[in-house]
Regions:
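N-terminal amphipathic/basic-hydrophobic helices that include classical n-h-c signal peptides
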Residues: 1-16
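Metabolite-binding pocket within alpha/beta catalytic cores that recognizes anionic/polar moieties
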Residues: 15-167
Length: 167
């Protein structure tokens, strides 16, 4: 049994308790519902992009591509780059879509789909966001490459996560 805290509430995870079909929604082929992916089809190193067309632009730089899948706006390519396995996936627009993608990626690596239970050892994914943004500073020219150290959301999504350590 694992104990963790979400927003001042202690939760107990029972690894032997099976997840209901409403808590883990799988397609007929046992892939996760929205992304249409199976656990072995993603890397632990994942680049997310908003625009589905940008997935092919990123994976064009891979040395090889082993998987190309699409369901709705969610496009995924998995392959290798400099001998490292990597996946790139589109999230679409908005925090609600990003939330779906992140939750389903987490399920892919931390839930045993065949028994519908949590794995005893959790896997942490390395997720990188690659995208475009406008700038309000006049000294930043169009087409500049920027690396953000922090970001802030003005929506309510973070209220559902234990994010106090981020602030």
């Amino acid at each position: 049994m694992r104990i963790f805290t979400i927003k001042n509430t202690t939760a107990f995870l029972n690894y032997s308790m099976s997840l209901a079909s409403s808590e883990l929604i799988l397609n007929a082929d046992q892939s996760i519902y929205h992304l249409h992916l199976k656990p072995n089809e993603i890397s632990n190193n994942i680049i997310t992009v908003g625009d589905p067309d940008r997935v092919a632009e990123v994976s064009a730089h891979f040395d090889s591509i082993e998987l190309k899948k699409q369901k709705r706006e969610f496009v995924t390519h998995t392959g290798t780059y400099k001998n490292k396995r990597i996946s790139v996936i589109s999230t679409g627009i908005g925090t609600d879509n990003i939330d779906i993608v992140l939750n389903e990626l987490d399920a892919l690596v931390n839930i045993d789909f065949s028994h519908r239970v949590l794995k005893e050892k959790f896997t942490q994914l390395n997720i990188f966001r690659l995208g475009t943004s406008g700038a309000i500073q006049a000294n930043i020219p169009v087409d500049s490459i920027l690396i953000s150290e922090k970001a802030i959301g003005l929506d309510a999504l973070l209220h559902f996560y234990d994010a106090n350590h981020l602030l």
